[in-house]
Amino acid sequence: MKKKTYQFEKFLKNTFDQFSIKQNEVLVEDDLNDIIMNVCGKALVLMINEKREMNLLMGNTPEERYQYFENEYSSTGKAFEEIKDKFPVIYIDLKNSINSYLKLVSQIMKDFKKDYSLLVERKIIEEHSTISTMKIKGDLHNGKAVIEITTNKSKLIYKPKSLSNDVFFNNFLKYMDSFFIKEGKSTKYKENFYLVNTLDMKTYGWVEYVDKKPINSFEEARNYYRKIGVLLSVAYTLNLTDLHFENVISQGENPCIIDLETMFNMPMFVKDYKNESRNIINGKIMDSVVSTGMLPVLGIDSLFGGDPSGILGGTFSKEERVIINPFRDDIKFQKIVVRSVFKDHIPFFNNNNEKRYCKPKDYVNDIIKGFEKTYKIIVKNKEKILGFLKKESSSVTCRILFRNTMEYSVLLNAAKSPVYSNKREEIFEKLSTFNRGLGNDIIKSEISQINTLSIPYFNCQVDSNLIKNMDGETIFEHTLTPFKCFLSKYRRLCVDDMEQQVKLIRFSIQSQEQLFKDGEQFSLYKKQKGSQEDLLIAINELSSILENNAYIGTSDDTINWMSLGIADNDQILFESLENDIYKGISGIGLALLEYYEFYPNINTKKILKLIYKNISKDFINTNNEPQNYGFYVGLIGEYSFLRKYEKVFHKTSSCNILKNILKDFTPEKCQTILPSDDVIAGEAGIIIYISNLNNYLEYRDEIDILLKSLSNKIKLKESIASYAHGNSGIATAFVHGYKVTKNEKYLKIFHELWNLENSSKLRRGWTDSRKVDSSYSSQWCHGASGQAIARMEWITVNKTARFLSNSELIKVKKELGELIDILKKEGMYTDNFCLCHGILGNLLILNTYQENFDNKNINLKNEILNNYYSVCNYGLNKGWICGLGTEFYSYGLMTGISGILYGLIRQVKQKNNFGVLMPYVD
């Protein structure tokens, strides 16, 4: 094996000498080197750079000066002594870490010798095995860690804790296998489960090393995924979580789970939104197969930068600290985003020394077959199985997570910096500041453990409500036990629940392959022949989807939806909605108000009343708290819903609310409460909205303040050809600013923004800044339809404000013609129906153009109508393309079902303006 190379190798060697590390401990040399660099690396980088800047290093090149540092400071022990003197905390960390690890290694050597015969008997090792090397796996907890041991013949795993969980799990799998055999459904497989060999020594244990192995046939691939389904059902039943890609290994046709710490998982503090409907949704997410971690759906509080699931995952981005300028005197650490790919959990063929992986999406039916078979056996034998669990699970220890371990890691990385090493109390005090409602005893124990550079660890017995730390001290008394939490769910297992979980399994695996496609086969959109009847039926179906899928809190009259979304890392997630217009309940409210005006009915009125009550209450309760004020994502948009609701239902006007929101605005305050400048979340969207109110002149001063703030924010060197996020939208805000204030400064900025956007002009269209191939888009958010809104609005405002010269007006009309041509030829064929980046948004804009700028063009009018009919026919027969499956939807106005409803109703009602896409709420 090639020897691993390290920076500052002479410092490492000197440290071995300083701590008198013996030669026979070379078997853990790499681990010790990693520990030393992990503790001292930042200090060494700081030290060599300081000496470089002080001209204390000899040599003509950075490499020569690095070698001088190694010879003069590292080899001689000067660097070691300097760390000891300047950073005593780091020295203590180093001493404790090395001593703890060497103590652990020594104990493992003794235990291996003592347990040798039993290890051979259990076939965990072969006869005549001797230890060659050891390697830490995972996190250190109080100086202890899981260790991968390599012998002269094979490998095995040492765990510094009882293996009672592993023993119980193996026994449960054996017990379940007896039911499969009795049912006669698994006799041809002989054994449904691969049981990992273990040797539990009560305070520590030995585990067989499970390595990935190839499969030999497609039948074995099907067997693997069938068994994945079986294990998924078992994990769901036992509240076994954290089954991400690192904890599942593909050993031929056998999936092996190698970490069982989170069995009988018990959520410590379910987030209380003080809102029953959101709590119901949150509980539904946590109490589903999603919580196992095996499915590619983002779980609550997950901080992975991608998909970590145990079935499909292993591809994600993460931030890593890497060495820049290695072996030079200007060496430094830099954080970079690394895209990592892991496939040990995916079955594969060996094909001419190349691995050919069997993707889960091709074996969904096998996964579901295994899940359903196991689930039905559990339901059929519920009391027998419960009796076994009560008897055999008493030895299970459940790991308790008060926080995501990534939060601890962030604090630990900061604490290791020489800059903060003497300020650790302040760093770790953040655990108290951001206490999440945790008690003092918990936080005290967290700080005590993290002070040893360990990830805090807590556990409790399955039948106990006492949460303990690593020292066995009780630090919290829960109201429930892990077994009672399990029992609550176990009692609810039934065929209906199984069918719901199966839908989640199928949806999550298939939809991760093709995001934002809806319908059983995720087919691409193709134009259909539809009718006016399709349009009316579609409106009723979409309104029913919204109303039937609302979650209502009966105790507090709250309402919400469990909506599908996409996280920043491109992972699917379920989420309850905020109050905003863009994808929240205010936006759904606007769509349902349009529907209610079209078809007044008691049920829609009831839903709208609940939405209004929610938004009004939150306005009152949170008006003084820091939050977003933008139109689409903040208070101004929520206000627009309240105003529209009061108009429809003839309630007392809330018009004073807008004045109250804006009264304290200053250009300085806008910099913090409006972090963006664009139409979506910044001043631009608010200016356009207010300027389209009938009484906009009453807000002249407020508009001027927003314009001043926007003027200070914008970057007149950046060209983003976009209405929602870029030049077109911001330029439109300044057009309205000029209309209201007649200030020539705003007109000048408009021209600069327009010219800047045209620097992104292609032969056809404008560059979509998100794309690397310099192509254009047809969407509202980043493309032609949004830019078309801007040009039409400029022409409309120019009729009274006269800010365009004749040549400029001709130019705007020419640009508008090109943008409309893009919409007609390309904007009707995108594989999404939503307002923001789909066909309904494009149709709404194209229809507004035809009615106001080309109203004699009957052919265009008919073409638009046929496209509306086509979308409706397709949606009714093949699925509404805006979510990720026919059972689960994105409900938001700009990205989901409610936006499709909004667009269709406005067509039927013949509303010939841009509506919320302006934004304008009529």
From Swiss-Prot:
The cross-references to InterPro entries, in alphabetical order and at most eight, read: LANC-like, Lant_dehyd, Lanti_2_LanM
For this UniProt record, the keywords arranged alphabetically read as follows:
Antibiotic biosynthesis, Bacteriocin biosynthesis
Oxidoreductase as a keyword of this entry, yes or no, is no
Which CDD domains does this UniProt record tie to the protein? Answer: LanM-like
Q: Which domain of life is it from?
A: Bacteria
A single BP term in Gene Ontology: bacteriocin biosynthetic process
Q: Name one Pfam family in it.
A: DUF4135
Keyword hit for Chaperone: no
The function of this protein is:
Could be implicated in the processing or the export process of the lantibiotic lacticin 481/lactococcin DR.
Q: Mind telling me what this protein is named?
A: Lacticin 481/lactococcin biosynthesis protein LcnDR2
| Protein species of origin | Lactococcus lactis subsp. lactis
